[in-house]
Amino acid sequence: MGGEGGADDSVVHFVFVHGASHGAWCWYKLTTLLVAAGFKATSVDLTGAGINLTDSNTVFDFDHYNRPLFSLLSDLPSHHKIVLVGHSIGGGSVTEALCKFTDKISMVVYLAADMVQPGSTSSTHDSIMTVGEEDIWEYIYGEGADKPPTGVLMKEEFRRHYYYSQSPLEDVSLASKLLRPAPVRALGGADKLSPNPEAEKVPRVYIKTAKDNLFDPLRQDRLVEKWPPSQLYILEESDHSAFFSVPTTLFAYLLRAVSFLQL
């Protein structure tokens, strides 16, 4: 467990990666619980998200989008046991980070996230973004209406149902002030990772959200079947945003997951 030990003492360090339109801010409950329990916990704003000043309409490359995460990981000391936690489409970001920083990462946790094996031809990008027949997404055309969209944001009237159906109203209100368009072109790069056998040796955990109106639990099951993780947990009362709706249960599952790490 993390603490103020010597430079060679192992420290469990959770690094949280948000999904589309969210930012480091959405993990405030989890990071508070983990730090109080003696762990290190860091949440990162990807390019164009949260308080990162980049205009998301200018982010076209997946590496560019993930650059703040890569910078953070490269700076962390070797005695930190890094546990990457990715939410929703942020699962693609943590998978790319796993492939680039395999030797530094001790575990990867996918929370209602796209968990696709590097080199696979399957994609969950569309499965998360497509919900029934409703037009729930607003597209931004930063280069003009005659060019492909540069950004995407869920329409305000749908957010409560799809993102936060079980979450406290104060968190819904907070999110309404902080959500930003996601760089839709950059996110397509999550499907283009090369096979990486070494990265596949790192323990993976999947946490399913059973009352998720955005990422159908049955689709989450298919991800688990295609690329089975070493641990599987189910948040029975969680919407898509477990960090808001069931933070204490999620916290308990994270503690259970890392208890299997060899420190």
UniProtKB/Swiss-Prot annotation:
Domain AB hydrolase-1, residue spans: 13-244
Class in the EC hierarchy, top level: hydrolase
Transmembrane segments: none
Means of activity regulation: Inhibited by methanol and phenylmethylsulfonicfluoride (PMSF).
Active site as annotated: S88, D212, H240
UniProt keyword annotations, A-Z: Chlorophyll catabolism, Cytoplasm, Hydrolase
Subcellular location: Cytoplasm
Pfam families according to UniProt: Abhydrolase_6 (PF12697)
Protein's GO biological process: chlorophyll a catabolic process; jasmonic acid metabolic process; leaf senescence; salicylic acid metabolic process
SUPFAM superfamilies xref list: alpha/beta-Hydrolases
Enzyme Commission code(s) on record: 3.1.1.82
Inducing stimuli: Up-regulated by senescence.
Gene3D superfamilies per the UniProt record, alphabetical: alpha/beta hydrolase
InterPro entries tied to this protein: AB_hydrolase_1, AB_hydrolase_fold, MES/HNL
Reactions catalysed, as given in the entry: pheophorbide a + H2O + H(+) = pyropheophorbide a + methanol + CO2
Subunit structure: Homodimer.
Family: Belongs to the AB hydrolase superfamily.
Protein task: Involved in chlorophyll degradation. Specific for the pheophorbides of the dihydroporphyrin and tetrahydroporphyrin types. Chlorophyllide a, pheophytin a and the nonfluorescent chlorophyll catabolite (NCC) are not used as substrates.
Protein name: Pheophorbidase
Biological source species: Raphanus sativus
